[in-house]
């Protein structure tokens, strides 16, 4: 026997939960008639993971400046961001007893630094607004009904009818969290929804012959990374860089990952904004000295980790980086070339090896084409009553809270539109389905 609801939200992540937290169905019925279908046994998994569990939920500063963080799609979603901006979400949390603060260049966190606090708030407000949460319900089919409305069917055999559906199923990054991209296939098959081919973004950059495994863990506060290829516009990223055992990570690498294709060239300036000429001059002075350790001098003059300086000097001599050499205590300058070392420090070049694994990507580029939606409401133009929010859409931002901000902005715009639609269109057309047959 089909259950019938005013609104079904498919996906219990950040976007889906904020939609429910801001859509008050009890205004129409004391018990409310909303349903959240979560594919996994644990809603809000990615929200709990954000900011290493501390919940980097947005970025501070002017919303005007935020638009650029979304690349080519920034202009298209500008109105969505303005309708519910970063200050609005900060105020929302504050009103509900979750104060926040800014750190790391503008990243916003709850003062408790606990993502679970934000998740609990969204879950509680969803229930207050008349939504029930069903866990372990993965939608496998969406069908338009002859008398308007939709029916959704799940893998476990359950089926529900509703007047409105909100697609909040996320992208494909971290598929173990439930967002594996399967809902795109369902929408494309059942409703002919256009889906832009997805690719992983906000992930480490893997290169051929990566040399820094022995010094993994070293980081740089300000490095410049750029991607070049024949006939391709140069893409640049400046920020923190982390050397891991297998690849380049940290914000600078994560933010340029989306521009990198296998075979492209990755250029790294570890001492940005210093130029090769400036660094060559510094090195000439160091290497011409008769006393002292050039590694110590290099680390001090350029504010670099000592172990990294040893590694660079070894590479300039054509030697592999291994633990014994890296921790060797003394050096001489025989064979060291200021120009060779400067080239490695200011323009270290590598060939991009492959696209990142979905299990390492923090976000998705691609998804439901924005052209399918009326971005004033987040409703599909060709499918009245069907909405989409968050990472399920073809929108991705740089690291720093921007992707969660779009999730919250789009969810709020959607909730506002649905609040009006349920009050007017659905009731006028007799589509309120808050009973059981």
Give each language-model segment a name.
Residues 173-186, 395-422:
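A conserved FAD-binding loop/helix module that cradles the flavin
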Residues 41-43, 48-49, 99, 194-199, ...:
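An anion/pyrophosphate-binding glycine-rich loop and adjacent beta-alpha core
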Residues 135-148:
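A conserved short coil-to-beta-strand element within the FAD-binding core of flavoproteins
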Residues 2-15:
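Beta1/beta-strand and adjacent pyrophosphate-binding region of the FAD-binding site
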Residues 8-10, 37, 159-175, 187-188, ...:
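Short hydrophobic core segments
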Residues 24-52:
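Glycine-rich FAD pyrophosphate-binding loop
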Residues 52-102:
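Glycine-rich active-site loop/strand segments that organize a redox cofactor
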Residues 135, 311-396:
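A glycine-rich dinucleotide-binding beta-alpha-beta segment and adjacent secondary-structure elements
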